[in-house]
Amino acid sequence: MKRKRIDIITLGCSKNLVDSEQLMRQLEEAGYSVTHDTENPEGEIAVINTCGFIGDAKEESINMILEFAERKEEGDLKKLFVMGCLSERYLQELAIEIPQVDKFYGKFNWKELLQDLGKTYHEELYIERTLTTPKHYAYLKISEGCDRKCSYCAIPIITGRHISKSMEEILDEVRYLVSQGVKEFQVIAQELTYYGVDLYKKQMLPELIERISEIPGVEWIRLHYAYPAHFPTDLFRVMRERDNVCKYMDIALQHISDNMLKLMRRQVSKEDTYKLIEQFRKEVPGIHLRTTLMVGHPGETEEDFEELKEFVRKARFDRMGAFAYSEEEGTYAAQQYEDSIPQEVKQARLDELMDIQQGISAELSAAKIGQQMKVIIDRIEGDYYIGRTEFDSPEVDPEVLISVSREELEVGQFYQVEVTDADDFDLYAKILNKYE
């Protein structure tokens, strides 16, 4: 008997992706054939997992829903369901505006979708997922929500307060994923450093990472989305002592000006920030720091922006992203501040900041020529094998390109390489040997 096909479309962040992967596993158990983010959706049923973080993400989600609603009207789709952050925030409004959708779910009640299809949610599969990533790496979500009160951020409004997963559940999930061939774990949360405070009454991230690192088969652990205030400094020891904890930290700093940090309600100062960066580099030699910065938040003066540029020049981040402020309804900034900085000024500041970082990135990449590094091969693309070092997270960071013609390599395997060339972003390398 031919199985019914369901198309899952995931928009937004890697935390959303984990939810989609859990749903896919449940749907497969229920007897469906499931595809993810296909360019040619042909299923009888579609599920769109939406993002509602900023204006562009909301627009993308709405356009995707409308595209599938049109397919349904044309008879190419029998059922259409929507879940995720956008529908968590605007469920009633969306249901009125887009009646072609059979049902909208929030971010946390997607299990009801199975019941609405006449199927059962299998509790015993709670740690299992159908991976959409290459089989050698996976995202590991350790908590939901956020207790921070940053002025510009709608995430706490959408996802609610911080809720940690239990340590044992996380460790069970890691063991399961290792059994499926996963070697590399991107540990993610809206706010990593708060992990455990709700369950264990203290920050437990260092202990969690240490315990994950002890599981046989875990080759790389990479940490994403830390917060600078009240950073759990015992994590430095874990990163220094454990070879399979990557010397990499993704920590969103947003700004450096004390004026802006106060307006953003970041609970951290310029002095605190510089001290934390210095401590990272002293305590964890060789660490690569990724950060995210914001320009154009209400109240940002030219002096504040000059201070931010000087910070980028001094800090010399290994990886950096930046974005322009966009007003999000319901946030403190939207209620208390006037979004008075013109869009063209925001964009000009963003471009200028990224130009500075591009020069820094080019210098840091060029300095790696001649170095030997351990890489994992993600895929083959054109004339190159595409790999990453421990300092590179999938999708967002530089890659290592190795010519296909030189040697046949295995996707998902580790190799020792020598860097032979570099551009502003990526490295080029030759193979020395395979890690057994």
From Swiss-Prot:
The record, for CDD domains, names: Radical_SAM (cd01335)
Indicate where this protein resides in the cell. Answer: Cytoplasm
Q: What EC numbers are recorded for this enzyme?
A: 2.8.4.4
**Cited NCBIfam families:** 30S ribosomal protein S12 methylthiotransferase RimO, MiaB/RimO family radical SAM methylthiotransferase
Write out the function statement from the record. Catalyzes the methylthiolation of an aspartic acid residue of ribosomal protein uS12.
Domain MTTase N-terminal as annotated: residue spans: 4-122
Query: Which co-factors does it depend on?
Result: [4Fe-4S] cluster
Q: Which GO terms describe its cellular component?
A: cytosol
Q: Which residues bind [4Fe-4S] cluster 1?
A: C13, C51, C85
* Binding residues annotated for [4Fe-4S] cluster 2, in chain numbering: C146, C150, C153
The record's GO molecular-function terms, alphabetically, read: 4 iron, 4 sulfur cluster binding; aspartic acid methylthiotransferase activity; metal ion binding; protein methylthiotransferase activity
Query: Reaction catalysed by this chain?
Result: L-aspartate(89)-[ribosomal protein uS12]-hydrogen + (sulfur carrier)-SH + AH2 + 2 S-adenosyl-L-methionine = 3-methylsulfanyl-L-aspartate(89)-[ribosomal protein uS12]-hydrogen + (sulfur carrier)-H + 5'-deoxyadenosine + L-methionine + A + S-adenosyl-L-homocysteine + 2 H(+)
Q: Which residues form the TRAM domain?
A: 366-433
Q: What Gene Ontology biological process does one annotation of this record name?
A: tRNA modification
Lineage, top-rank taxon, reads: Bacteria
**Xref: PROSITE patterns:** MTTASE_N, MTTASE_RADICAL, RADICAL_SAM, TRAM
For this chain, the family text in UniProt reads: Belongs to the methylthiotransferase family. RimO subfamily.
How, per the record, is the cofactor bound? Answer: Binds 2 [4Fe-4S] clusters. One cluster is coordinated with 3 cysteines and an exchangeable S-adenosyl-L-methionine.
Q: Which gene encodes it?
A: rimO
The UniProt keywords, alphabetically, are: 4Fe-4S, Cytoplasm, Iron, Iron-sulfur, Metal-binding, S-adenosyl-L-methionine, Transferase
Tell me where in this chain the Radical SAM core domain is found: 132-363
Q: Provide the protein name.
A: Ribosomal protein uS12 methylthiotransferase RimO
